[in-house]
Curated annotation (Swiss-Prot):
GO terms for cellular component: endoplasmic reticulum; Golgi apparatus; plasma membrane. This is Protein YIPF4. It holds the Pfam family Yip1. Interacts with YIPF3 and YIPF5. Its main location: Golgi. Residues 1-115, 162-168, 219-225 are cytoplasmic. It comes from Mus musculus (Mouse). It is a multi-pass membrane protein. It comes from the Eukaryota. The keyword Membrane applies. It is found in: Golgi apparatus, cis-Golgi network membrane.
Amino acid sequence: MQPPGPPPAYAPANGDFTFVSSADAEDLSGSIAAPDVKLNLGVSGDFIKESTATTFLRQRGYGWLLEVEDEDPEDNKPLLEELDIDLKDIYYKIRCVLMPMPSLGFNRQVVRDNPDFWGPLAVVLFFSMISLYGQFRVVSWIITIWIFGSLTIFLLARVLGGEVAYGQVLGVIGYSLLPLIVIAPILLVVGSFEMVSTLIKLFGVFWAAYSAASLLVGEEFKTKKPLLIYPIFLLYIYFLSLYTGV
C-alpha cells in the first residue's frame, strides 16, 4: 500500500481571493478613484445665519419670540359666521313675513322664537333708504322709531302677561316692515291716483300689522289681543307716514 501523496494545489474559482507571496506583491501598485459625488444638504448662508440668530436669541432668553402658535380652527371662520349672519335663515324669515297665511305651511314661529339682529336691521335700513326723498334725517327717525317702538310693544306685552323678549319684538317689528317695502314701488306708479294710492297704503299697513301681530300675539293674551294689535297697527301707520311724508 502506497502512502497518500500531497494534496492537490487549490485552484481558486472566479470571484475568490487569490493569495500571492509577499515577494510577488512588492511590484503591485495602483489607486482607487473616488467617485465625484456632491451632496446637497440644503445648507445655505441664510440658514447658517438663521441658526446663529436662533442660538443668540435662545442664549439671551428670547426664545419665546421663535415660538409658532398652532392655528385655532375657530380663527378661520368665514366672516358671515363670525358676525353670526345666516343668509338662509334671513331669507326664510322674509318669506314667513311676506306670506303670513298658515295654509302655506311655513313655520312662522321661527321669526319669533329664533330672533336675529342683522336681518331686521337690513330691512329697516332698506326702508330708510327708499324713504329718503332728499331728507337724510328720515333714516335716523326710522331707526329710532324701530328701537323705541319695539320697546313700547315689548313693555305692553309684558304688562299683559306675554312671555316675549325684547330681541324677539325687535326682530318681528323689523322684519314686518317688508310689506311696506313691497308697496313702495307701487305707490310710485299709482301716486297720481289718490283713491288707489290710499287703498294700497291701507293694504300695506294691514299686511305689516297682521304679520307682526300674528307672530307676537300668542294664546296667552286671549281676550287681550286688541290691546296689543292696536298699537302695532299705529306703529306701522307712523312708519308709512315717514315714507310718504304725510
